[in-house]
Amino acid sequence: RQSPSEMRSSNLAKVLARDKKLQQIASRINKVANDVEAVVMPAIVGMDSQEAVSFIRDRVQKPLHFIATMPPSVPGVRVQTLLRKYFANLGGVYMLGNRVTGGCIEDGRLRYVETSLLPDERLEASDFVLATGSFTSDGLKSNYECVYEPIFHLDVTAPADRMQWVSTSVFDDQPYLHYGVRVNALQQVQKEGHTISNLYAAGAVLGGHNAA
């Protein structure tokens, strides 16, 4: 061990990506797990695919289960990788590091968006999905006066009174965790009380969604 980062789950998963290493781990588990009903180990197997998980489960003689580790999450990275591949197979283009900075809303529709890495390009589409997350991913922001959605300045579910944003006890359910953009039954967002017909919201940016 040269540094603490070597013990991160993602680093361990890279080491355990080889069948030889997984076989060694399985053999050692089998030697000490004779009198147990099941084996539980950290989720540090299968960064890129499910194959490594299936490989070690087939070789451990007891039911093998995985529990989550501290971030980064190996299963989470795997799911993200698979979703990106599936998205690409459907014809999607993933622009790593690019951020939507704004757009043009006219006549109740989002006409195009502008991005940080393509400042001179307008990205047009018939429909758009807003999935920017909550406060931790900057999908929502706040200042001393209000909670707001920073890209299109959409309507949000937060009250104007700042004193209502938090509970006095840190152990209570915090109201701000439920804030998000206001949508209708079709998940279409609203701005100044008017529905944007081709802009939909999904995930933690939705009002009522508690990301915690």
Q: Which ranges hold each PLM region?
A:
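Residues forming the flavin
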Residues: 1-212
